[in-house]
């Protein structure tokens, strides 16, 4: 009995530390999200025409990455301290899309990135199928 009570107390303490860490991370991500909003506004309203379209698209994708990480943390607290797999897949797809937009010099690399996106989409389909669905 004493061992199981100690284990439960240790698990609760570690869960509290994890929750505090995630709240700190969420706060940092919100700050970066606000900074990215100002950056997007600056690129949209002030930048020159030549570079602004690439910077705008890259900024939008980075914005969505921050947004997805914040949504993942929110979902973690809403779902009883559980990270849904599909949110990690969404983040992976968005990160690879950003990589394609930023670094598209090599056609073979772009093809490999596209294949990785296809693999992640198939994984997302399988994760959302009735056989594997938990939610």
Curated annotation (Swiss-Prot):
Major localisation: membrane
Domain of life: Bacteria
Keyword flag Glycoprotein: no
Membrane-crossing residue ranges in chain numbering: 14-34, 54-74, 82-102, 107-127
Record keywords, A-Z: Cell inner membrane, Cell membrane, Membrane, Transmembrane, Transmembrane helix
NAD keyword on record: no
Pfam families on file: PsiE
Localization terms from the record: Cell inner membrane
Recorded topology in the membrane: Multi-pass membrane protein
Gene Ontology BP annotations: cellular response to phosphate starvation
GO CC annotation: plasma membrane
InterPro entries xref list: P_starv_induced_PsiE (IPR009315), P_starv_induced_PsiE-like (IPR020948)
PANTHER family tied to this protein: PROTEIN PSIE
Family listed: Belongs to the PsiE family.
Protein name: Protein PsiE homolog
Originating species: Pectobacterium carotovorum subsp. carotovorum (strain PC1)
